[in-house]
Regions:
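HTH-adjacent hinge/linker in prokaryotic transcriptional regulators
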Residues: 2-103, 111-119, 134-139
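A residue-level structural signature of the nucleotidyltransferase/glycosyltransferase Rossmann-like core
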Residues: 121-122, 171
Length: 256
């Protein structure tokens, strides 16, 4: 059996493999498995985090996702998965409500899936989503203004934040790059994450739609902690372990 205490490169390679398989690692478990101290494991995780492989959390680490592509690129990725998730999100919306739809390819698919016979007030910061919603004659559509960010395809600056603070939403459908029970919902763009924070404060119910590879994972900036999310809509191959961990934060999990 390999003496992992004497071979840090092999040890870190195994940790990386475990991260890829499980999405997260726990220091105490790794220390027991590899026959080294927790201090050594924390040092390994520090090195891996510097390489962008993982992000350290309390007691261990979670796998880090690559930087998010622009919205134009994301629309062509995981189309079928996002369509299924979007249709499940659309079924959560009740006629007569006021909802917010965030930017993102899954939320764009959700806007397309909303039944035209619903009477809704829909607020969005995405010009592309607003254009889809305007095709549905019973929808009152409110477009938040300001400069349009190329990466997200939405308005996320001070003007949009000021406008959203005057509206109360029955439901908010928030996009996210990554989520874990410990780190909550996270994203890669600071301005976009700050805008999402402002929206969530105005929502009676906050709903996050994610493909399974984004759980568990951590991006650079925190949007909100897990306890502030009410619903996660995700593929049915989400790990039972993480579904249970999210439910411990009183989050309802809807799978497709």
């Amino acid at each position: 059996m390999l003496d992992y205490a004497a071979f840090p490169e092999q040890r870190q390679a195994l940790i990386y493999q475990i991260l890829q398989e499980n999405g997260r690692v726990i220091c105490s478990e790794l220390a027991n498995r590899l026959g080294v101290s927790e201090h050594t494991i924390r040092r390994d995780l520090h090195e891996l985090s510097k390489d962008g492989v993982c992000k350290k959390v309390y007691g261990g680490a979670v796998i880090a996702l690559p930087e998010s592509e622009d919205i134009a690129v994301r629309k062509g990725i995981n189309v079928a998965k996002k369509s299924n998730i979007a249709q499940r999100c659309a079924r959560l919306v009740k006629s007569g409500s006021c909802i917010f739809i965030d930017t993102g390819s899954t939320n764009l698919a959700m806007a397309e899936a909303l039944p035209a016979e619903l009477a809704l007030t829909v607020v969005t910061n995405s010009p592309e989503i607003a254009a889809v919603l305007l095709k549905k004659p019973l929808f009152e559509v409110i477009m938040l203004g300001g400069a349009v960010q190329r990466s997200s395809g939405g308005c996320v600056g001070a003007s949009a934040i000021a406008q959203v603070q005057d509206i109360l939403f029955d439901q908010g459908f928030i996009g996210g790059c990554a989520m874990s029970p410990e780190s909550g919902l996270t994203g890669f763009d600071y301005a976009d994450c700050e805008f999402k924070k402002a929206v969530i404060k105005q929502c009676n119910e906050t709903i996050v739609a994610l493909t399974a590879e984004k759980i568990p994972a951590v991006a650079r900036y925190v949007v909100t902690e897990s306890s502030n999310i009410d619903v996660i809509v995700v593929e049915d191959n989400i790990s039972k372990k993480y579904a249970t961990a999210f439910q411990a934060h009183d989050i309802r999990i809807y799978t497709v």
